[in-house]
C-alpha cells in the first residue's frame, strides 16, 4: 500500500505514514495515473482525453465547461509559442506551456517503460497533440 501525493511537500512527513510508502510523481493527474499503472504491472495502457492542445477554434475546453471564463486570452497568449505535431501526424497544433510539459513527461515515461518493461501505450484521444511513443487508435477500438 502507498499514499499518493501530487508533489512532495515537507508536511507529508508529519503524517507519519512511512510504513505505507509514498508515491510522488507527475505534474498532472494523468501523468501520475500513467505511472501508477506501471507500478500495478499493466502491460497495455490506454490514454483517453489527453488532447494537450487547443482546439482549432482556440478553445481549451468544451464550450459548456463551467470555468471556461478562467481561460480567456490563453490561446492568444500561447499562439505560436508551443506548436507541436498533431495527433495523426498531419500538421501542427497550438499547445500551452503546461500542456507541453505534460506531453514531454508522458513521452519520457512512455519511452522509458516501453524499453525497460515492454509496456505498450495507446493514445485513443483522437485529436490534439501527438504523444510520441504511443500507438494512435480510435476511441471505439479501446471499448
Predicted segments — roles?
Residues 1-143:
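Metal-ion/cofactor- or nucleotide/acyl-coenzyme-handling active-site neighborhoods
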Amino acid at each position: 500500500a502507498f499514499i499518493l501525493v501530487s508533489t512532495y511537500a515537507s508536511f507529508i512527513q508529519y503524517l507519519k505514514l512511512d510504513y505505507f510508502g509514498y508515491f510522488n510523481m507527475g505534474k498532472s493527474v494523468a501523468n501520475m495515473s500513467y505511472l501508477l499503472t506501471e507500478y500495478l504491472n499493466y502491460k497495455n495502457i490506454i490514454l483517453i482525453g489527453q488532447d494537450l492542445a487547443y482546439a482549432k477554434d482556440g478553445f481549451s475546453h468544451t464550450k459548456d465547461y463551467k470555468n471556461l471564463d478562467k481561460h480567456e486570452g490563453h490561446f492568444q497568449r500561447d499562439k505560436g509559442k508551443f506548436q507541436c505535431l498533431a495527433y495523426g501526424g498531419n500538421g501542427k497544433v497550438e499547445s500551452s506551456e503546461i500542456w507541453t510539459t505534460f506531453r514531454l513527461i508522458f513521452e519520457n515515461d512512455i519511452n522509458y517503460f516501453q524499453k525497460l518493461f515492454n509496456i505498450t501505450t495507446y493514445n485513443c484521444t483522437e485529436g490534439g497533440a501527438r504523444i510520441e511513443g504511443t500507438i494512435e487508435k480510435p476511441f471505439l477500438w479501446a471499448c
